[in-house]
């Protein structure tokens, strides 16, 4: 059952170990492999600098190897398959060569190089190392500028990452901190704490209390991805609805790259609002639009059922904007016999049983 992440925080843990894993079946192994312990999985640039030069700090007991997930943008989306195959081969060679920490990085992104989506690269490498029987010999650390939100971290952890450095998010925090009256250290600490709380909440929904149990568990469901694509790069993830595949996913990354580096000179230094969190006229679509909110407010102020019906139509009829799976479906009414309204309990009677804690009560 789910865990209450606040009241039951005592049984939760974000501790992560980076590096080789001990053989759980070898009860006589008195010298298990050394691992790096981190109290939470979000790493700063200073932490990454130590990992990049970990051999010098540990007399060669740990050795790290970078895996660059970028490739020339002029290869287009067609270059992604060969690049992933090359990354997988490099990873296996590195493990067999004695490296026990692999750093998946997109820092080489430039005008001429585009990055493979970091979740795709991480999951592909994680799966390939498992299939080659060497996954427990190495730790996976992600260094990416595309990781920002809690769910980004949760997905990476769920598909094999042991720690993540969101370097662009951290750089953004440091640039914004003085404007908010914060020190850079406080801003970063607040962000790390917030992501940690979010990860605990995500795990708690599935009844998982420790990050070590959540890592690599792949407790997700894919929506809008092709079955063969998911089977190849996200093995074990259910996908009940078809959709786009590898090349379409990479084409979106290429399009974003070209939009970023091909920006109008007059817009230099400015970023489009995007509208991911708050509605914008030229941004991402939202279910809650200004029109819908106005209709709802007017219906309650004027006690107008007609206005409420207009609001309900905007929310319920999703076939026009097709933002959800429900918007792609239709009710099967052929051969159905409607129930007479006289046999249905009136709405006025139903709402009397409504309570604020109804969902908690069950």
Describe each model-derived feature in a short phrase.
Residues 86-90, 121-124:
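Well-ordered alpha-helical segments embedded in enzymatic catalytic cores
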Residues 146-160:
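Catalytic cores of alpha/beta
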Residues 114-142, 190-197, 201:
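Alpha-helix-loop-beta-strand connector modules within alpha/beta enzyme cores
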Residues 107-109, 145, 161, 168-173:
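Short, ordered loop/turn segments at secondary-structure junctions
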Residues 106, 125, 156, 210:
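Conserved, mostly hydrophobic/aromatic
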Residues 1-83, 90, 94, 98-101, ...:
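Flexible, glycine-rich loop/tail regions that form catalytic "lids" or insertion modules at the edges
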Residues 111-124, 172-182:
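Active-site-adjacent beta->alpha loops and helix N-cap segments on the catalytic face
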Residues 105-114, 139-146, 356-361:
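Conserved short loop/turn motifs at secondary-structure junctions
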